């Protein structure tokens, strides 16, 4: 067991080194890995000390530590399974709206994570020309402009029609992404209603319009694969009934870091009542 703990500590340090060499020190949550390495090293040293001083140390500290770590591992395992179920969601064609969730931007350029989402959005827009894309993302503290504006320019440059794009530039987290995007969708539906009313009024027929309720509207959420479960759960918590997922791939090297970070984000949102 001591050897296993020492090996786990070494793997955590190697993985952290790989992240730093590949992407630098800017990856969020990456310090979790040296912390885990220190924890595994501490446990290995503690077990070694216990084996050499077994008669002097009571059993309850060891039992307590194993119980706590086992419970934490079980919770994380369950959440990881839930994240996996989000990735397996099938994509629906011809949705009315697709909310494209923003991610970090570098100056006026999308980050690698955001670029993968946008490339997926381009593919969906080409195959579903009647679907509106709601580009959702405000301006972060270390960002020059709103994420939605960077997304808009990238999609326009890659041939997505301006008429297919709607912007939401106020949100700073996933909960706000969904909330403010619903407001954009509702405003668009109300505008369509006014247009319908004007058209039918001019031709002298009874007015019919879609109304501003979102119950009958099919809404997709496009985000990174690991993020899809939480995004859909937040949307359902906010009352979005017909919500579907569209996943974009993640950087293979960062998958362990992204998935574990998402575990803690899901637990936090559950505790805060967001899902």
Which residues fall in each region the model found?
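Hydrophobic alpha-helical transmembrane segments of multipass integral membrane proteins
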Residues: 7-17, 42, 67-80, 263
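Structural signature of transmembrane alpha-helix termini at the membrane-water interface
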Residues: 15-25, 49, 77-85, 267-274
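Generic hydrophobic, helix-prone segments enriched in Leu/Val/Ile
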Residues: 17-18, 65, 229, 255
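Transmembrane alpha-helices and immediately adjacent membrane-cytoplasm interface residues
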Residues: 44-89
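A structural signal for short, hydrophobic/glycine-enriched beta-strand patches
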Residues: 78-261, 265, 271
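Membrane-embedded alpha-helical segments of integral membrane proteins
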Residues: 1-50
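Structural motif marking the loop-to-transmembrane transition
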Residues: 1-4, 57, 61, 252, ...
